[in-house]
């Protein structure tokens, strides 16, 4: 398995999503299987409650995920359905870890960013 990371820090609207989708299409046409993933550092669970003036309109996936507009670009360019497996927010990661802590899955450990959050990301 090979990974390509495209990062833009805090710069928004410069075409990272379209560039990523285009690179994916080139790889697909060369016979590679492509699975785009988008990770957002905001603490919202999904993009559905973010002010569209601030972040753009959310893209509604077939599975009900309210994702970033880039997920729509991935769907259109790559001709693949995207969903919750393709769009992850830091809020969703924290939510998963907190739910596990509430179910006592950490056996009473102190739940911390390292290692619990980082393990969830990996």
Specify the residue positions occupied by each region the protein language model found.
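Flexible phosphate-sensing "switch/lid" loops adjacent to ATP/NTP-binding sites
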Residues: 1-122
């Amino acid at each position: 398995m090979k990974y390509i990371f495209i990062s833009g820090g805090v710069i928004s609207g410069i075409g990272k999503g379209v560039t990523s989708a285009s690179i994916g299409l080139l790889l697909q046409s060369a016979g590679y299987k492509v699975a785009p993933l988008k990770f957002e550092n905001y603490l919202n669970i999904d993009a559905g409650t973010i002010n569209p003036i601030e972040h753009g309109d959310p893209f509604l996936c077939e599975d009900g995920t309210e994702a970033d507009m880039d997920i729509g670009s991935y769907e259109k360019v790559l001709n693949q359905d995207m969903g919750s497996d393709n769009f992850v927010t830091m809020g969703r990661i924290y939510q998963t870890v907190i739910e596990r802590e509430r179910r006592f899955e950490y056996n009473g450990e102190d739940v911390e960013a390292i290692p619990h959050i980082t393990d969830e990301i990996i």
